[in-house]
Structure formats: structure tokens, C-alpha cells
């Protein structure tokens, strides 16, 4: 299932950040390994679409700007 959200924070040096999922405002962890091909970094305020790896620690994957 694909979700949308807004990047709350992303540290390109560390390769980690958070996306605020819409509409429930849940914060989802994103790592550089979860970025879609061609996306090298995210920036605060970017609107994104992504899938969620539903495990113990939910993480965004296939993250792309919209």
C-alpha cells in the first residue's frame, strides 16, 4: 500500500530521517536505503510517496518526491 507524507527531518550525512504520514500524522522512519532509485536525499518539507515495511520497526521504502 502506498502512502503520502511530508519530510519532517532528513540528515543526508547520516542517511536517516522521518516522514509525517498523511492523514494520521504518524512519524515513519526513513533511511537512505529506502529511497527510490534516483533520489539521493530528502529535504524538510518535501512531499513524498512511499511504501511502508510493516515490521517491528516500520520504515519507509521506495520513497519518491511527488
Regions found by a protein language model. Name each.
Residues 36-49:
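Short nucleic-acid-contacting surface segments enriched for D/E, G, S/T with interspersed K/R
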Amino acid at each position: 500500500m502506498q502512502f503520502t507524507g511530508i519530510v519532517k527531518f532528513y540528515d543526508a550525512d547520516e542517511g536517516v530521517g522521518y516522514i509525517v504520514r498523511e492523514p494520521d500524522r504518524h512519524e515513519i522512519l526513513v533511511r537512505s536505503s529506502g529511497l527510490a532509485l534516483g533520489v539521493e536525499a530528502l529535504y524538510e518539507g518535501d512531499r513524498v510517496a512511499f511504501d511502508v515495511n510493516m515490521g517491528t520497526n516500520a520504515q519507509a521504502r521506495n520513497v519518491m518526491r511527488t
